[in-house]
C-alpha cells in the first residue's frame, strides 16, 4: 500500500515515522509533502527511502491512501489543489484534522457527483512513540479497505473503527485523556515531593506504577474495581487513601472533565 501524507508537522511527521518503523508499509511507499523543506529534510535524514516533496499533487499521484495532516483552515485549500489529481475509483482520502466531520469533508471532495472512500482518523500524541489510541470513522469504503487501515494504525498503538457519533466521547477519552493522565502524574509527583521524595524519583515511581497497573488490567481483563479490591485490605492504607480521594471528588472530577471536553 502506498500512502501520501500531506503535511509534515507534529501529527504528519509522527505518522510518517511510525509507518517507516512498521512492517506493513514499505518506506519507499511513503510520500510526504510539506510547503517548507526543513521538516522534509529531517525526515529524509532519518529515513532516506521516504519520498519527500513540496508538491502536494506529486505526493498523491500514485498513493492508495491520501492522509491530510494540515491545519484545519488549510483543508479546503489543499483539497481544491489535489482534487483534480485524485482518482476516486482507486484512492481513499483520510483526514487527521480535528473538528471535521464526514459531511464537510465529503462536500469539499465532491467532483462531478463522485466521492472517494473517506476516513476520519483521530490519533493522540502518543503516535509519536507508536502507542496511540486511534479512532477511525469510515464512509463509502470497503471492508477490505477498513481492515487494511486499522491494521496499519494498530502498528502505531491500538486502532478502533467507530461510528462518527461516537467520536466526541472517544476523543475525550483518548486525545484529551492523555493530558488528563499527565495531570494525574503531575499531581502524584507533587504529592511525592511533599512526602519527601525527590521530584525525578517520584516521576519514575509514578510512571512505572501506571505501566504496571495497565499491564495487570490488560492481562486479567478484569474490571478495574476487581483489581482495586485485590490491593485494599480492611483498615489498610490503600482504602484510606482511596476514600480520601473520593471525598475530594476524584471520580466526579474525572467524569466532569470528560463531559466538558466533549462540548464545543
What residue spans do the PLM features occupy?
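Short acidic capping loops at alpha-helix termini that bridge into adjacent secondary structure
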Residues: 26-29, 89-91, 117, 200-201
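NAD(P)+-binding Rossmann beta1-loop-alpha1 motif at the extreme N-terminus of oxidoreductases
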Residues: 1-54, 58-61, 131, 193-195
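Internal alpha-helical scaffold of NAD(P)-dependent oxidoreductase catalytic cores
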Residues: 104-117, 133-169, 180-219, 264
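Rossmann-like NAD(P)(H) cofactor-binding subdomain of soluble oxidoreductases
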Residues: 15, 37, 47, 56-136
Amino acid at each position: 500500500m502506498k500512502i501520501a501524507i500531506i503535511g509534515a508537522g507534529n501529527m504528519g511527521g509522527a505518522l510518517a515515522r511510525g509507518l517507516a518503523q512498521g512492517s506493513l508499509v514499505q518506506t519507499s511507499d511513503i510520500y510526504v509533502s510539506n510547503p517548507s523543506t526543513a521538516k522534509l529534510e529531517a525526515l529524509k535524514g532519518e529515513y532516506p527511502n521516504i519520498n519527500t516533496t513540496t508538491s502536494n499533487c506529486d505526493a498523491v499521484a500514485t498513493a492508495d491512501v491520501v492522509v491530510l495532516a494540515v491545519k484545519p483552515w488549510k483543508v479546503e485549500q489543499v483539497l481544491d489543489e489535489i482534487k483534480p489529481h485524485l482518482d476516486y475509483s482507486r484512492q481513499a482520502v483520510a483526514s487527521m484534522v480535528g473538528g471535521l466531520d464526514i459531511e464537510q469533508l465529503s462536500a469539499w471532495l465532491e467532483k462531478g457527483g463522485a466521492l472517494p472512500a473517506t476516513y476520519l482518523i483521530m490519533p493522540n500524541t502518543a503516535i509519536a512513540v507508536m502507542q496511540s489510541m486511534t479512532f477511525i470513522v469510515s464512509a463509502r469504503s470497503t471492508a477490505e479497505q477498513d481492515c487494511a487501515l486499522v491494521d496499519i494504525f494498530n502498528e502505531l498503538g491500538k486502532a478502533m473503527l467507530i461510528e462518527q457519533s461516537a467520536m466526541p466521547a472517544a476523543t475525550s477519552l483518548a486525545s484529551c485523556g492523555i493530558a488528563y493522565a499527565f495531570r494525574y502524574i503531575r499531581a502524584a509527583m507533587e504529592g511525592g515531593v511533599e512526602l519527601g521524595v525527590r521530584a525525578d524519583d517520584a516521576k519514575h515511581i509514578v510512571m512505572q506504577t501506571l505501566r504496571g497497573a495497565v499491564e495487570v488490567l490488560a492481562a486479567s481483563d478484569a474490571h478495574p474495581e476487581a483489581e482495586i479490591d485485590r490491593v485494599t485490605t480492611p483498615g489498610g492504607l490503600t482504602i484510606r487513601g482511596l476514600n480520601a480521594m473520593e471525598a475530594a471528588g476524584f471520580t466526579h472530577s474525572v467524569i466532569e472533565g470528560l463531559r466538558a471536553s466533549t462540548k464545543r
